[in-house]
Amino acid sequence: MLLVDDHAIVREGLKRVLCPKGSDWALTEAETGFQALELLRTSEFDLALVDLSLPGMNGLELIRRIKTEFPAVRVLVLSMHAEEQYALRAFKAGANGYVTKDMAATELVGAVRRVVAGGAYVTASLAESVVRQLNGSAEAPRHALLTDREFDVLRRIAAGQRLTEIGNALHLSVKTVSSHKTRIQDKLQVAGTAELVAYALRNRIDDAFPEQ
């Protein structure tokens, strides 16, 4: 399996959990999405364990690239980000499972086994949330209407980044970022930056999207 995470201490800890002495699993490490794609092009992997907070190429984009170039590779997201903000976006990108880094080791191993075997892994709380939205007993939040790019811009605005900083980080012009901001405000039905930030804070979006 291929583990994609930019923190060495996290990779080492996961290696001890997933590949103890005598394990049948072998683990190859990558620090960035670009490095992961190069490894996938030169070696065969059954599973990619992908963190969402990756430098240069965020986890969602990496998942899409993997599923486009290597459709047979299973993808399990391993993230510090709350599933209620991010799991559905990961599944829409092509992920086969989503777990958080505070999950118990035995549960993580079980999730890996299920995804490698061809199944999907979702937590009970996420499954319940999806069912409640589908049967109408709970409404999807307004920010569910945002594209991944818009969601990223919203998170950055809420974190205090200026439009020029966002443009530099995402390789976009300030005009394009401003257009994204306008569409976000329309979708969230808020009037300006202050209301936009307040909405993000209420919905825990200020730290929900991975850095890039």
Q: Where are each of the predicted segments found?
A:
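Short amphipathic alpha-helix used as the core "switch/output" element in two-component signaling
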Residues: 38, 60-72
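Recognition helix of helix-turn-helix DNA-binding domains
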Residues: 162-195
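Short, flexible helix-to-coil linker/hinge segments that flank and couple to helix-turn-helix
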Residues: 85-92, 96-148, 152, 194, ...
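The feature encodes the CheY-like receiver
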Residues: 10, 55
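Helix-turn-helix DNA-binding segment
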Residues: 139-175
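Acidic catalytic/metal-coordinating carboxylates
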Residues: 32, 58-61
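Acidic, metal-coordinating helix/loop segments flanking the phosphotransfer/catalytic sites
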Residues: 29-47
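Active-site residues of response regulator receiver
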Residues: 51, 79
